[in-house]
Amino acid sequence: MINKNISIQINGEPFNCSEPLSLQFLLNYLDFNSERIAIEINSTLLPERLFHSTYINDQDKVEIITIVGGG
């Protein structure tokens, strides 16, 4: 089996991994609370219910938007 590195962008910054990752695994690895963020992959907004079943592909562009309350 040949291992191919996966190169993606997270908020415009390069990120490499050695195997496909679920979006939820990536969020956990980066220490994001999935209840307080919005995620776009390749300009498509994903609902939170799809975080576990969505896998990151080579050359994907991931935007992680943190939701902050204020007043």
UniProtKB/Swiss-Prot annotation:
InterPro entries: Beta-grasp_dom_sf, Mopterin_synth/thiamin_S_b, Thi_S, ThiS/MoaD-like
Major site of localization recorded for this protein: plastid
CDD domains for this protein: Ubl_ThiS
A Pfam family of this chain: ThiS
Matches recorded under Gene3D superfamilies: 3.10.20.30
Compartments, record wording: Plastid, Chloroplast
Any Gene Ontology CC annotation: chloroplast
Keyword annotations from UniProtKB, A to Z: Chloroplast, Plastid
PANTHER family: SULFUR CARRIER PROTEIN THIS
Similarity remark: Belongs to the ycf40 family.
Protein name (record): Uncharacterized protein ycf40
